[in-house]
Amino acid sequence: MPTAYVVLLVSNLIFATGYSVSRIVLEDIGPATLAMARLAIGSLILVPWAWRGMVAAKLSREDHWRLALTGVVGFTLAFALGNWGLAHSTASNAALLITVEPASLILLSPLLLGERLSRREGLGAALAILGAAVIVVNGIPGVTQALVPHWRGDVILILSGVAYAAYSLIARPVLLRHPALVVTAYSILWGAVAMLPLAVLEWATGPPPVWTPRAVVGTLYLGVVMTALGYAVWNWCLERVETPRVAIFLNIQPLGGALLGVWWLGERLTAFTVAGGLLILAGLHLTVKARRRG
């Protein structure tokens, strides 16, 4: 197996732990505060590490705009929406709904990269969207039950998955011209700058964060391992592996994340949640198979 594939496998297994860790930390601190802490820690690690490359990089005006956009979309929006959604949903649902990201990669690639969408890919994306809807509704309205209490959180998590997909697509052209470490450092720095107003607003209007030992340890893990190292490795893989193939490995996250939510947090998976997850995986398999044939 190529080295990049092994790295993708391991990195997605690590990313799968983030849902349960974040769910625990969010019991003590607010969503924007956690996102700000992750981005601040990531910036403090990556910027000094990548400083020589950042100074030496000959970035065009388009590169600067893309890096700013990747920071705002892929870090500020994705992190904030992910945390807010997770605070009002479950770690298991968050893990399953991340499969919206690869489907979004297929849907957004024609818009952002000029790639054509085949009928099979469109059908696969539709199945993935249907699966996400089944998870959000968790049944048939009027037949089984009304929308579950955390449906709003699930919808926000879907938007977070779309933001993550947009990040990968926006960043890829820059990654083909500049080192992954430089792109990651710039992006996270922009994300931290854009997140600061949201964090300040949360501090001013909400309860103060409670920095319990588990909140500190969890935040450090999310900042160092998941953000700084995780995204540096992720961008390294994006340099070497085509986006549709990267999407295949994202399937590891819902399985690992959902199992951790059940085992670690005692969450329950309903039949509709499992069915929705299977629909998403079936849709993703269809789109990837179509892309391979194309």
Give residue spans per PLM region.
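Glycine-/small-residue-enriched transmembrane alpha-helix faces in small-molecule transporters
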Residues: 1-36, 143-173, 193-197
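Alpha-helical transmembrane segments of compact multi-pass small-molecule transporters, enriched
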Residues: 6, 18, 41-45, 97-111, ...
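Transmembrane alpha-helical core positions of polytopic small-molecule transporters
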Residues: 12-16, 70-79, 102, 136, ...
